[in-house]
From Swiss-Prot:
Kelch repeats: 134-181, 183-224, 225-271
Organism this protein belongs to: Arabidopsis thaliana
SMART domains with a match to the protein in the record: FBOX (SM00256)
Keyword Mitochondrion part of the UniProt annotation: no
Keyword terms of this UniProt record: Kelch repeat, Repeat
Composition skew (Basic residues), residue ranges: 1-15
Pfam family, one: F-box
Entry keyword annotation includes Zinc-finger: no
Domain F-box: 20-66
Protein name listed in UniProt: F-box/kelch-repeat protein At3g08810
Taxonomic lineage of the native organism: Eukaryota, Viridiplantae, Streptophyta, Embryophyta, Tracheophyta
Region span, Disordered: 1-25
């Protein structure tokens, strides 16, 4: 007696069909239109999907589409110094994944490494300034006292460095800043105190113009200071203050109850983050260790006016929107600069 042939069941351990990395089947122009509507915080994650995604996310056409659709946004960049040079990172969203209870309390932000072909040139904190989608490195020599006239630009769209027109003269003790929406460089052309010079970059003409009548007192703000909506803020020994121009004195920034205490010797940097204050610092381990964390807090600012004995009194309150660990690095890494570009 013959039995009908049974279909052989696939073994539970049989090798599954090979699958390739998903390749986008949509035309590039459609993908660009979609990417232009996605927050740039997700771009580092999207760039890992495929090589074509990575190419589209770095294309000039994408940022033209973002500009035309009104989807430009601010992007926070962080520069760190290590033994082999300088490394750049950008604020991004963590990929969606199954999270533990502790991870659910996280802000969801992290610092993603910015791949820069050829690496980064030598930079200093005072030599860097962000204008639009570019970060300018003005006379960024390693030795602060050495003179230089070189200028290079980091294009935050393609993440590539390019050379820019040099300053007309070499400057030492250089400091870069933004004044009236224009990038500038200022410093001393020689050892004399009266040799302080200020230059502003004319992007249309591609040249540096010498500005007369501006003294050194108008500049030289360290990274523990920042200006937000024409108000100066500072931090020293963990105390945040703002300058009241009406009474000409510094006042304490109130609130900030959720802000943790900084470790002794921490480098704290402030930045204008779209009208809010971004605070980044390196948190050293409580016990001697080989790693430390780069932490960040974003603070919303609110001006409040009250009257005390018929006298007007202004105060500014800060509300911590989120605070989190963004990156773990060796203790030998130094926090150099925090910049905010518009893309």
């Amino acid at each position: 007696m013959s039995y009908p042939e049974r279909k052989r069941k696939r073994s539970r351990w049989s090798k599954p069909h090979s699958t390739q990395n998903p390749s986008p089947s949509l035309p590039d122009d459609v993908l660009l239109s979609i990417f232009a509507r996605v927050s740039r915080l997700y771009y580092p994650t999207l760039s890992h999907v495929s090589e074509s995604f990575r190419s589209l996310l770095a294309s000039p056409e994408l940022y033209k589409a973002r500009s035309l659709s009104g989807n430009t946004e601010i992007c926070l960049y962080v520069c760190l110094r290590c033994s082999t040079g300088y490394r750049w990172f950008s604020l991004s969203r963590k990929p969606d994944q199954t999270l533990t209870y502790e991870e659910r309390k996280s802000s969801g932000y992290a610092l993603a490494r910015v791949p820069i072909p050829g690496g980064s040139p030598n930079v200093r904190s005072s030599s860097l300034v962000a204008v639009g989608s570019d970060i300018y490195n003005i006379c960024g020599s390693i030795n602060k006292a050495s003179s230089s006239s070189s200028v290079s630009i980091l294009d935050c769209q393609s993440h590539t460095w390019r050379e820019a027109p040099s300053l007309p003269v070499e400057l030492s003790s250089i400091s870069a800043s933004v004044r009236d929406g224009n990038q500038g460089g200022h410093g001393y052309s020689d050892s004399r105190k009266n040799s302080f010079k200020v230059f502003a970059y004319n992007s249309k003409e591609g040249r540096w113009d010498h500005l007369v009548g501006l003294g050194a007192g108008s500049f030289m703000l360290p990274d523990s200071y920042c200006v937000i909506d024409n108000v100066s803020y500072s931090v020293s020994d963990g105390m945040f203050r703002w300058y009241d121009t009406e009474v000409r004195r510094w006042k304490d920034l109130r609130g900030l109850f959720q802000l943790p205490k900084f470790s002794a010797g921490a480098c704290v940097i402030l930045a204008d983050y779209g009208g809010k204050m971004a605070v980044l610092w390196d948190q050293l381990p409580y016990h001697h260790g080989f790693h430390k964390t780069i932490q960040c807090a974003v603070i919303a600012l609110e001006r409040r006016t009250s009257f005390v004995f018929r006298e007007k009194s202004c105060q500014i309150w800060g509300k911590v929107e989120w605070v989190d660990d963004l990156l773990t690095v060796p203790t030998s890494y130094d926090l150099v600069k925090v910049l905010v570009a518009t893309l």
